[in-house]
Amino acid sequence: MEEVWLMVSPLNPLKTGAQLSPDAERLEMARLAAAGLPDVHVSDFEMHLPRPSYTWRTLRALRAAHPDMEFSLIVGADNWLVFDRWQHPEEILAHHRLLVYPRPGFQVDESALPDGVVYVHAPLLPFSSTQVREAVRRGEDISEMVPPAILERCVARYKLPTE
């Protein structure tokens, strides 16, 4: 894999009632998180597509916009376990390699993965974005959960405590 594109998605259709920050704020947070990672690029590509946002539509648009590139999709184990509920999962699998990243509490049977789907043996991240958002809503210290640039932004915006 030459580089990773972080697609900031307007809304996950499977997460009804989710409270999201405005698109511009989420995009800026992603850019802060990726700062200093030379092979990670934050993209607003998906924000310019029709809503609701569906992965098959995004991947189809990426293939059309960049016909010389090959795209893989990285999803968490939690999303892989509901992948059959996504719109057009067969189209995604027909055109893209799918990498499943481990998530605490979600077990994936590697022997049952279809062709083109690879379970990535990688370190578990200690916190999910949901846990960070919940801590921010409760006004808790998130200094152990996020990079310094994100912490600085959240402390200023949400008046959070620091160590």
What are these model-predicted stretches?
Residues 1-163:
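Nucleotidyltransferase catalytic core that binds NTPs
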